[in-house]
Swiss-Prot record:
Gene for this chain: CRR7
GO biological process, any: NAD(P)H dehydrogenase complex assembly
Transit peptide: 1-68
Location(s), subcellular: Plastid, Chloroplast stroma
Protein name (database record): Protein CHLORORESPIRATORY REDUCTION 7, chloroplastic
Length: 156
């Protein structure tokens, strides 16, 4: 199988919004032309290597090749706001301290004498509440109370 590779380098003048410095985007595009049999698959059909992960889409017009970029998402940023869902009540927006106070109240007034095994392993009730806030999003309460759910949200 013979392949002829053609390498093109597009040096674009668009500035990326996600960077603090004025960087230019260079896109390397490799075209592969070959004579493949009918049963084979061409895995190298116009691959484009984007050097930056924030590029969403590209547009090609008559005279130039432009790249559109977005800001970097703040996926790992923490928020202090939670949505609290209690059985029989509307959703409430609460802060982390208010959520911890509510959960502490539920654990102090637990219907059964001992806490569930995953919460009973903690020495202090505050450690159990911290574990619930950071690692769990639902507390199943024994009896007819039901469950309490909370989700971390970011308000804009």
């Amino acid at each position: 199988m013979e392949c002829s590779l053609q390498k093109q380098l597009f040096n674009n003048g668009d500035k990326l919004f996600s960077s603090r410095h004025n960087r230019r985007v260079s896109i390397e595009q490799v075209h592969v032309t070959d004579s493949l049999s009918v049963n084979s698959i061409n895995l190298f059909h116009k691959p484009i290597c984007y050097p930056i992960s924030s590029i969403i889409t590209s547009r090609k017009s008559k005279s130039h090749f432009s790249v559109c970029a977005t800001r970097r998402r703040r996926v790992h940023s923490n928020s202090d706001t939670y949505v609290l869902l209690e059985a029989g009540q509307d959703e409430q927006f609460v802060t982390e301290d208010e959520l911890k106070a509510k959960l502490r109240g539920w654990l102090e007034n637990w219907p059964v004498n001992s806490l569930p095994p995953d919460l009973a392993r903690f020495d202090d009730l505050d450690e159990a509440v911290d574990f619930l806030v950071k690692a769990v999003c639902e507390l199943e309460i024994d009896g007819e109370v039901g469950s309490v759910q909370w989700y971390q949200v970011r308000l804009e």
